[in-house]
From Swiss-Prot:
Disulfide bonds join 44-57, 101-221, 108-212, 113-170, 234-264, 244-256, 312-345, 396-465, 403-438. Glycans are attached at residues 37, 70, 114, 148, 156, 173, 186, 201, 213, 245, 255, 279, 285, 296, 307, 317, 372, 378, 466, 482, 485, 631, 640, 656. Residues 722-885 are cytoplasmic. The record marks 531-532 as: Cleavage. A motif (YXXV motif) lies at residues 727-730. A motif (Di-leucine internalization motif) lies at residues 884-885. Residues 403-438 are annotated as: V4. Residues 113-169 are annotated as: V1. Residues 532-552 are annotated as: Fusion peptide. Residues 1-23 form the signal peptide. This is Envelope glycoprotein gp160.
Length: 885
């Protein structure tokens, strides 16, 4: 039983040691390549910082390289903060370019307009020659009217079908600058901006501004022409942009494996148009389609091989004249010297081949379930809605063009060849041309928010715009299983989903938590060689995102320094731009974004450092703690797991671990505070420090003064006691008097020798020499004090020894027993090991002998069989010989 008990004790000790050694503790890593989705504001960078819209953008130096990382991420062009910011920012720039500030509510009055013109353009119901009723009977094939740069009608603006611009002159009376005095004003309006009523007057019609009573309409205070701006988005310090670099990405990819990381997007150009996207940066030598995940909204990138372009022109001259309506209110009118011709656009390039490729690409799209016959896939215009929907809407240097695209659609679709019936009811629209007529409006619907704006007249003179068509905005409508329509759309926002839909914004989370077997204050401070920062750029450390956790952790020091250096560098760049452009911060949205970006970056860095500091890990790359890992079953695979994968697994533990780390740090600070109270006792060598001797002398002087004061008190008490016995020391004796007055007592003999004290004789009178006796008295008292201290210390030490002696003896006995038990167990193990060795040797010897014997028998048997086989011919020959004999 004793042996069994010893064995159980040893087993328990081994299990305890094993548990202590196998406990995992939380370790904090700073600089790990991990991230999470973010929604913070981005800022812009551009090469052309001379335009009004880019004055606050950072200078672009094309030094925005991309790094491929071995990770898998989800991308969605429609659920994307980058595209949403682009849409909002471009709208703000678009709105700022016109600077609306003057409300035109005074113009919501009845105006007297030229009836001939209102009838001509069909505003009063008396249509002139503008429309003709057409039946839906079959029509013969119509010849195409295709023009190019060499066609003379382009120069003369005299191409067939183009008419005069529909404009109407109106008059109205208002109270002007003089009180109670009306003034008549003359203005010229585009016909589509007015709504008129029948009037009894034969020469005038009663007209109003269209929708003036239902919307807040504003006019520009100053004219800024909406020219295209090229810029790129950049992430603030501490953030990054991921891009899906897969050619098969179609707007939504839950698992994109070809991912690159950068600090900025590609260059993009501001686009504001319906139906088409112009001058985009995503055009490639192929056609591809971004398809919304939950609807039929699409954005189609056209093949740049076909060189698709659109050229628009507003012919003839115009004169712009400001009209003062009242004090502080000015409206701009357009007096017409002669009837101008309408604006128009023509298309160049291989449009038919491009549209055919769009149809073929649509058939191959995984989301498409309609007919596979491209001849039954039609490119159509929307059925109705706002003018920006039914017409192709674009801006040409300040002029807002609304182009009727029927001629163009007939041309690219060859509609007269498809069954012989036209889908339009107007014979004028039954033509096939590569150019289209456009009308101009001064009151337009806003494309991002509900509302209307009145724009200033554009520049005077002839205006021409040239654009490259790079995309189509469309919705896929399945009429039935045999027919599909590609319906053009007015979703301007889709243009930016194509431009930036393959990006996603992430926040770098450099703080990682993982279990290790190292506990705080148990590591040895190994010396490290100083290294310079490995220049990978700000996001260089994310190149290790696809590496295993162990490999990434080796370079945490360099990664964290690179992270900090990149943050500081970008902070300085932003600060320089803000300082240079302080006076322009209110011009565009970028000034505010730059400030907000800087604040965001500072807040993120301070937040990370504050969190590390609350854990006691400030400015450390690897920080071991005393907090046990809360989930023993969740252990990282350091050789085959990335930090991003690990962070996703432990995300649910982060709050609990954070709380435990903070509590442990608070407890550690309390312990340090208690330890600092004993700071003078931690190192005994400090007692002999030269600076401590002054303090020791002070303590000695205070002790001496205390002893003297104590003795004075004792002397006073004794003196009072002697006075009660009949003695009276004289304190006020003259200097020559050296002896007290003798005081006689009775003749009774003392009961004990020396009862009355030392110094007097045994007679009837005594005296006390004050000066000498007091010195002797002090010496005796000091001797008594030292003797008492010595006796007390000796007794205390003796008692301590007597108390500790049994404990020490018991501890010594226990250690001897443990040593004896360990010696016996080691002897058992040695004996067992020797027995095991002997058994293995005996088994090996037996197996060897058995194998040798068996091999000998097998070899002999094989020899016999072989000899028998070899003897067969001889036996046959001998048999034949015997037969012949």
């Amino acid at each position: 039983m004793g042996c069994l008990g010893n064995q159980l004790l040893i087993a328990l000790l081994l299990v305890s040691v094993l548990e202590i050694c196998c406990v995992q503790y939380v370790t904090v890593f700073y600089g790990v390549p991990a991230w999470k989705n973010a929604t913070i504001p981005l800022f812009c960078a551009t090469k052309n910082r001379d335009t009004w819209g880019t004055t606050q953008c950072l200078p672009d130096n094309d030094d925005y390289s991309e790094l491929a990382i071995n990770v898998t991420e989800a991308f969605d062009a429609w659920d994307n903060t980058v595209t949403e910011q682009a849409i909002e920012d471009v709208w703000n720039l678009f709105e700022t370019s016109i600077k609306p500030c003057v409300k035109l509510t005074p113009l919501c009055i009845a105006m007297r307009c030229n009836k001939t013109e209102t009838d001509r353009w069909g505003l009063t119901g008396n249509a002139g020659t503008t429309t003709t009723a057409i039946t839906t009977t079959a029509t013969p094939s119509v010849a195409e009217n295709v023009i190019n740069e060499s066609n003379p009608c382009i120069k003369n603006n005299s191409c067939a079908g183009l008419e005069q611009e529909p404009m109407i002159g109106c008059k109205f009376n208002m109270t002007g600058l003089n009180r109670d005095k009306k003034k008549e004003y003359n203005e010229t309006w585009y016909s589509r901006d007015l709504i008129c009523e029948q009037s009894a007057n034969e020469s005038e019609s009663k007209c109003y501004m269209h929708h003036c009573n239902t919307s807040v309409i504003q006019e520009s205070c100053d004219k800024h022409y909406w020219d295209a701006i090229r810029f790129r988005y950049c992430a603030p310090p501490g953030y990054a942009l991921l891009r899906c670099n897969d050619s098969n990405y179609l707007g939504f990819a839950p698992n994109c494996s070809k991912v690159v990381v950068s600090s900025c997007t590609r260059m993009m150009e501001t686009q504001t148009s319906t139906w088409f996207g112009f001058n985009g940066t995503r055009a490639e030598n192929r056609t591809y389609i971004y398809w919304h995940g939950k609807s039929n909204r699409t954005i189609i990138s056209l093949n740049k091989y076909y060189n698709l372009t659109m050229r628009c022109r507003r012919p003839e001259n115009k004169t712009v004249l400001p009209v003062t309506i009242m004090s502080g209110l000015v409206f701009h009118s357009q007096p017409i010297n002669e009837r101008p011709k309408q604006a128009w656009c023509w298309f160049e390039g291989s449009w038919k081949k491009a549209i055919q490729e769009v149809k073929e690409t649509l058939v191959k799209h995984p989301r498409y379930t309609g007919t596979n016959d491209t001849r039954k896939i039609n490119l159509t215009a929307p059925a109705g809605g706002d003018p920006e929907v039914t017409f192709m809407w674009t801006n040409c240097r300040g002029e807002f063009l609304y182009c009727k695209m029927n001629w163009f659609l007939n041309w690219v679709e060859d509609r007269d060849q498809k069954g012989g019936r036209w889908k339009q009811q107007n014979r004028k629209e039954q033509q096939k041309k590569n150019y289209v007529p456009c009308h101009i409006r001064q009151i337009i619907n806003t494309w991002h928010k509900v509302g209307k704006n009145v724009y200033l007249p554009p520049r005077e003179g002839d205006l021409t715009c040239n654009s490259t068509v790079t995309s189509l905005i469309a919705e896929i409508d399945w009429i039935n299983s045999n027919e599909t329509n590609i319906t053009m759309s007015a979703e301007v926002a889709e243009l930016y989903r194509l431009e930036l839909g393959d990006y996603k914004l992430i926040e770098i989370t450099p703080i990682g938590l993982a279990p290790t077997s190292v506990r705080r204050y148990t590591t040895t401070g190994a010396s490290r060689n100083k290294r310079g920062v490995f220049v990978l750029g700000f996001l260089g450390f994310l190149a290790t995102a696809g590496s295993a956790m162990g490999a990434a952790s080796v370079t945490l020091s360099a990664q964290s320094r690179t992270l900090l250096a990149g943050i500081v560098q970008q902070q300085q760049q932003l600060l320089d731009v803000v300082k240079r452009q302080q006076e322009l911060l209110r011009l565009t949205v970028w000034g505010t974004k730059n400030l907000q970006t800087r604040v965001t970056a500072i807040e993120k860095y301070l937040k990370d450092q504050a969190q590390l500091n609350s854990w006691g890990c400030a400015f450390r790359q690897v920080c071991h703690t005393t907090v046990p890992w809360p989930n023993e079953t969740l252990v990282p695979n350091w050789n085959n797991m990335t930090w991003q994968e690990w962070e996703r697994q432990v995300d649910f533990l982060e709050a609990n671990i954070t709380q435990l780390l903070e509590e442990a740090q608070i407890q550690q600070e309390k312990n340090m505070y208690e330890l600092q109270k004993l700071n003078s006792w931690d190192i005994f060598g400090n007692w002999f420090d030269l600076t401590s001797w002054i303090r020791y002398i002070q303590y000695g002087v205070l002790i001496v003064l205390g002893v003297i004061g104590l003795r004075i008190v004792i002397y006073v008490v004794q003196m009072l006691a002697r006075l009660r016995q009949g003695y009276r020391p004289v304190f006020s004796s003259p200097p020559a008097y050296v002896q007290q007055i003798p005081i006689h007592k009775g003749q009774e003999p003392p009961t004990k020798e020396g009862e009355e004290g030392d110094g007097g004789d045994r007679g009837g009178s005594r005296s006390w020499p004050w000066q000498i006796e007091y010195i002797h008295f002090l010496i005796r008292q000091l001797i008594r004090l030292l003797t008492w201290l010595f006796s007390s210390c000796r007794d205390w030490l003796l008692r301590s020894y007597q108390i500790l002696q049994p404990v020490l003896q018991s501890l010594s006995t226990t250690l001897q027993r443990v040593r004896e038990v360990i010696r016996i167990e080691i002897a058992y193990l040695q004996y067992g090991w020797r027995y095991f060795q002997e058994a293995v040797q005996a088994w090996w010897k037996l197996a060897r002998e058995t194998l040798a014997s068996a091999w000998g028998d097998i070899w002999e048997t094989l020899g016999r069989v072989g000899r028998g086989i070899l003897a067969i011919p001889r036996r046959i020959r001998q048999g034949l010989e015997l037969t012949l004999l």
